Amino acid sequence: QYILLIDGVENIIPQCTRYRVLNKAEQLRKHGFEVKVVNLSDFQLSMAQNASYIIIYRSPISPELLRLCHLAKEYGKPVFFDIDDLVFDTVYTDQLSYTQGLNSVEKGNYDAGVRNYGYMLENCDGAITSTNQLQEELYKYQSKVLLNRNLASDDLIAISSQYIKDYSQTSDIVKIGYF
């Protein structure tokens, strides 16, 4: 058995795939779980057959994912929708600077995409998100909402640790910085 992670972004937004899919898979593996990652466009229902949990990251509803949710429920396999932006309810879309410049057709298409994320969220057993604010908002739509913050990968930590400054030396010099 394994945790199946379905990436709806498919690395089109690399930082989303990195933090919400690949780093999550690495984190789960470090805790002893077997994890399989698949892009949404490559997903087949048979991939979920031996999964114990299914996490769907930022994927719009589709007939195949809806069938997955129904089958998973039938077989007692929890499905979580992972989302890290307010892109699951159109109540927020008028407030975005991005949508201000869209014509009515473009705005309609954008809102349709947001509604499709919302429908996917509704069909899952719970949600996973990255911030306290999103967690609170998601409680309006799901009773089970897990907080899993974005994490640095082991590779990034290894690279960063090479540049850690030694602050153990004391000095009488006071340094002031303006940010």
Predicted segment positions?
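An aromatic- and histidine-rich active-site surface loop
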Residues: R58-E74, D82-D94
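Donor nucleotide-sugar binding/catalytic pocket of nucleotide-sugar-dependent glycosyltransferases
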Residues: E122-D166, K175
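Membrane-proximal helix-turn-helix segments that form the acceptor-binding/catalytic region
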Residues: Q49, H70-E74, S104-G126
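Conserved donor-binding/catalytic core segment of Leloir-type glycosyltransferases
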Residues: L4-L5, Y167-F179
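Structural motif
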Residues: Y53-Y57, F80-D82, I128, G177
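Acceptor-binding helix/loop patch of EC 2.4 sugar-transfer enzymes
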Residues: F81-V114, D155-S160, Q169-D172
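Short catalytic/ligand-binding loop motif for oxyanion handling, primarily in non-cytosolic enzymes
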Residues: I13, L45-M47, S62-L65, V87-V91, ...
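N-terminal pre-catalytic "stem/leader" segment of glycosyltransferase-like enzymes
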Residues: Q1-I56, P60
